[in-house]
Each structure stands twice: as C-alpha cells, then as structure tokens.
C-alpha cells in the first residue's frame, strides 16, 4: 500500500491510497476537499478511481467529490451511515470492515468534532480526519467534551507503529501549544525543533507515528499526571474526570488559537 498526500485548500490533505504494484492503477481517495489537484494527480499517474472514503461531512473534506467523479467516474462513497452527507453509497458503522485495494480497513466511530465522524484504521495507517491531528485534535462545536475525549482514548489504544494521516497540517502550532502545556517534556521540545525546521523548508509534517503522538500530543496525554496537575490548577474547582480534563485542555487551546502566539517563531 502506497499513500500519497495532496495538499488542498489552505491547510487540508486529501489522501490517495495506491498499490505498491505499478501495474495496478486502481486508487482510492480520502476526504477530497477540492477536485482539481486530485484529477491532475490521477491523470498524470494514469490512475483509475476505485472508491472514496469520507471521515465526516464538512465541506473542506467533501466539496471535491462531485468534480472528481465527473472527471474520473462514479465510484463507491464510504462513510458513516448516520451522517448527513446524502451521496454516501456504502454506509458503515463501528466495527465494519472496508476493502481498499488488497487491504482491509476497520471503521472506528469517533464522535466529537462531528456526530458522525469516523476513522479508517489499518495496522499501518490511520485516516483520522479531524479527530486526531499531528500534535493536536479537532475542535468540538456542539458535542459534549466527553465524546471527543473517549474517541481520542480509543485511538490512543491502537498500535504505536501505525502512521497517522490526518485532515490538516497544523503540526507546528499544535506543538507550540504542547510546549506550553508540558514545558519540561524533552520529546515535545525535540519534535517541535524538527517540525519547525521542516515547516520552514515546506516539508510536510504529516504523517506521523502514533507512538510519537502518544509521547508528544497533549490531547492523548490529558490523563498523564504532570499534565493533569497543570489542568486542575486551571480549573475553578479541581476535577480529574476525563471529560473535565479534556474540556479544560481544549478550552486552553481554543483561547490561544484566538491569538497569533502558536504560529509565531517560524522566521526566527
């Protein structure tokens, strides 16, 4: 299995899943937020569109679907059975399996960013959409914090060597926040230095090993004792429940997202 990332819109990724066999021209795409880059890549590489995986319904993950199929042909659209996106042809739910080329992906329901959000898991690859980012996690809008916390803990239980293919490139800002949340964690400082260099050189920071996320992503570490203590100190009434810890962490990140502090320093 070969996975290629196509940068789309301002900071999105559409993922192309291809065969390692050069004679097999079938390929799937994940979360096409726009069509032209996908069409160009398929035509340039003489690929045949075989199917589409959708993690959730937001426009920046779905707006390219019709344009892609107009150009490359209609195919199966696989997404959550409960989602509002009507063109889904193959609805799936927790525990279902999806055959992609010669590989099998497991469907994991991860509500939080949206009600119907799902991830597609293979021991080598996790398409995490806007649930788990490199160094961070997706925003929660109207859903309860405990939903997202539980979804992230489900993903944390997956194998360390799995590569995380998320929906956006937010790695530098996310790790700047991780440094603020856990300032004395060497793994975070080392990763931030590497990510800063790569970002300055326009080298993608996605994908990343899930094992590295477990070491450096505060949204997979909110129940880690030192970070727990920091979060409880930010609460009016200290509470170590998973939902409250996560909500405190997410609110802290949201607060800093309103400033430019997390994007600063790239030109230093």
Swiss-Prot record:
GO MF term set: hydroxyacylglutathione hydrolase activity; metal ion binding
Enzymatic reactions: an S-(2-hydroxyacyl)glutathione + H2O = a 2-hydroxy carboxylate + glutathione + H(+)
SUPFAM superfamilies according to UniProt: Metallo-hydrolase/oxidoreductase (SSF56281)
EC number: 3.1.2.6
A Gene Ontology BP annotation from the UniProt entry: methylglyoxal catabolic process to D-lactate via S-lactoyl-glutathione
Keyword Metal-binding on entry: yes
Gene3D superfamilies with a match to the protein in the record: Ribonuclease Z/Hydroxyacylglutathione hydrolase-like
Pfam families found in the cross-reference section: HAGH_C (PF16123), Lactamase_B (PF00753)
Pathway: Secondary metabolite metabolism; methylglyoxal degradation; (R)-lactate from methylglyoxal: step 2/2
Cofactor(s) it depends on: Zn(2+)
Free-text remark on how the cofactor is bound: Binds 2 Zn(2+) ions per subunit.
Residues annotated for Zn(2+) 1 binding in this entry: 56, 58, 113, 130
InterPro entries for this protein: Clx_II_MBL, Glyoxalase_II_hydrolase, HAGH_C, Hydroxyacylglutathione_Hdrlase, Metallo-B-lactamas, RibonucZ/Hydroxyglut_hydro
Entry keyword set: Hydrolase, Metal-binding, Zinc
Positions with a binding annotation for Zn(2+) 2: 60-61, 130, 168
Family membership noted in the UniProt record: Belongs to the metallo-beta-lactamase superfamily. Glyoxalase II family.
SUBUNIT field: Monomer.
Function: Thiolesterase that catalyzes the hydrolysis of S-D-lactoyl-glutathione to form glutathione and D-lactic acid.
Protein's recorded name: Hydroxyacylglutathione hydrolase
Organism name: Hydrogenovibrio crunogenus (strain DSM 25203 / XCL-2) (Thiomicrospira crunogena)
């Amino acid at each position: 299995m070969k996975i290629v990332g196509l940068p789309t819109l301002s900071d999105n990724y559409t993922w192309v899943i291809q065969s390692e066999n050069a004679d097999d021209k079938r390929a799937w795409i994940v979360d096409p937020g726009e069509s032209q880059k996908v069409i160009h890549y398929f035509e340039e590489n003489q690929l045949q569109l075989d199917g589409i995986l959708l993690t959730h319904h937001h426009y920046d993950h779905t707006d390219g679907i019709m344009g892609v199929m107009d150009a490359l042909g209609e195919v199966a659209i696989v997404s959550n059975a409960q989602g509002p996106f009507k063109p889904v042809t193959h609805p799936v739910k927790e525990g279902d399996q999806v055959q992609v080329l010669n590989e099998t992906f497991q469907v994991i329901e991860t509500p939080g960013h949206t009600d119907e959000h799902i991830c597609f898991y293979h021991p080598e690859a996790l398409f995490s959409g806007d649930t788990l980012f490199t160094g961070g996690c997706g925003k929660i809008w109207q859903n309860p914090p405990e939903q997202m916390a539980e979804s992230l803990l489900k993903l944390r239980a997956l194998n360390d060597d799995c590569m995380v293919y998320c929906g956006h490139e937010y790695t530098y800002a996310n790790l700047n926040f991780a440094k603020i949340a856990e300032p004395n964690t060497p793994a975070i400082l080392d990763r931030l230095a590497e990510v800063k260099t790569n970002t300055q050189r326009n080298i993608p920071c996605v994908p990343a090993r899930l094992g590295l996320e477990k070491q450096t992503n505060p949204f997979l570490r909110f129940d880690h004792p030192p970070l727990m203590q920091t979060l409880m100190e930010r609460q009016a009434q200290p509470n170590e429940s998973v939902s409250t810890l996560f909500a405190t962490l997410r609110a802290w990140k949201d607060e800093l997202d309103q400033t430019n502090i997390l994007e600063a320093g790239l030109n230093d």
